């Protein structure tokens, strides 16, 4: 590991290169990248030149525009100016409302009401035993039709 305090003060474009004879050489550091690399901008670069004999270059024949383009290109709008259009109602065919649900019959829900019966037992005359017997009543409930 290098001492980061000493490397911190060296300018970025100058890097200490150790030569095979272990002597420090101060050269401007250039990464090893091909000259024609498009990602690395250089002051001096070589343009690829195609050398050809003087010959006729075939060109595309211009055809008439018979088939119109199917894709309509809309101009780009910024999101702040885009308004959400309301949903378009499609042509709805009138459908008769047929009630597929059978006629609603009242549902009987049993409710329990505890009743207290005081029964006097001859063995224990001074004590009362409380027994509760549920009494069922039916209430007709109709569910609303959806």
UniProtKB/Swiss-Prot annotation:
Residues the record marks as carrying a glycan: 107, 112, 125, 142
Organism: Tapirus indicus
Phosphoserine: modified positions: 125, 143
Localization per record: Secreted
Family: Belongs to the kappa-casein family.
Encoding gene, per UniProt annotation: CSN3
Protein name as catalogued: Kappa-casein
Keyword Secreted assigned: yes
Major localisation: secreted
Chain positions of site Cleavage: 80-81
Pfam families, per the entry: Casein_kappa
Tissue-wise expression: Mammary gland specific. Secreted in milk.
Keywords carried by this UniProt record: Glycoprotein, Milk protein, Phosphoprotein, Secreted
């Amino acid at each position: 590991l290098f001492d980061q305090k000493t490397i911190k003060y060296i300018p970025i474009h100058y890097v200490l290169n150790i030569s095979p004879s272990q002597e420090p050489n101060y050269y401007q550091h250039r990464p090893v990248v091909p000259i024609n690399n498009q990602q690395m901008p250089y002051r001096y670069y070589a343009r690829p030149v195609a050398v050809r004999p003087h010959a006729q270059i075939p060109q595309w024949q211009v055809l008439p525009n018979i088939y119109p383009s199917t894709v309509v290109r809309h101009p780009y709008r910024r999101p702040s100016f885009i308004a959400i259009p309301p949903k378009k109602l499609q042509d709805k065919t009138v459908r008769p409302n047929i009630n597929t649900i059978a006629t609603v019959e009242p549902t009987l829900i049993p409710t329990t009401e505890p009743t207290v019966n005081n029964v006097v037992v001859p063995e224990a005359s001074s004590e009362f035993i409380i027994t509760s017997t549920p009494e069922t009543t039916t209430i007709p409930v109709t569910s609303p039709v959806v």
